[in-house]
């Protein structure tokens, strides 16, 4: 429920923020297109991460959490792509991003693990994954967007925070 509310707020902010022309890339500023492209990349990576547990988790709650995470990010990616299309923005996800590194690390950490060892590791990685995206969004991304995109970045943080809180509940089971 919390994730759905955060997701709706985030999508709402994206839907109602004014359409912006592409900004020149100076002083590390992200244009609307670059911001949406970054978020699209992060959604794809998060879906790939979630699918690791969808296919390999032994615990039903872990599988369900992974399915919910994949679905939430899939829905968000689709909405983001529709908004970009409506605004005539061409998304070009960055080649490398924090989420790319996180995905590589997760695959490496989960390699060879099965059963409870896999589940426990994935849940901890999921919590760390979301925490890292929240911190990066707050410290790096928000510092690089103009005031007109701050609501989008803030709603994205809130949306991720709700997912993190849900994952934290599951994490307690594996302590």
Map each language-model feature to its residues.
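His/Met- and acidic-residue-enriched segments that coordinate or traffic transition-metal cofactors
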Residues: 18-175
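Bacterial N-terminal signal peptides
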Residues: 4-16
């Amino acid at each position: 429920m919390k994730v759905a509310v955060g997701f709706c707020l985030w999508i709402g902010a994206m839907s109602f923020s004014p359409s912006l022309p592409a900004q020149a890339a100076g002083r590390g500023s992200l244009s609307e297109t670059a911001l949406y492209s970054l978020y699209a990349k992060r959604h794809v990576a998060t879906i790939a991460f979630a699918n690791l547990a969808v296919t390999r988790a032994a615990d039903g709650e872990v599988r369900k959490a992974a399915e919910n995470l994949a679905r939430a990010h899939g829905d968000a990616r689709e909405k983001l792509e529709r908004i970009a299309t409506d605004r005539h923005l061409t998304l070009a996800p960055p080649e490398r991003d924090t989420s790319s590194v996180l995905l590589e690390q997760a695959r490496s950490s989960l390699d060879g693990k099965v059963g409870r060892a896999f589940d426990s590791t994935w849940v901890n990685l999921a919590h760390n994954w979301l925490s890292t995206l929240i911190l990066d969004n707050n410290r790096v991304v928000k510092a690089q967007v103009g005031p007109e995109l701050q609501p989008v970045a803030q709603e994205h943080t809130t949306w991720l925070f709700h997912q993190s809180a849900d994952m934290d509940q599951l994490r307690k089971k594996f302590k």
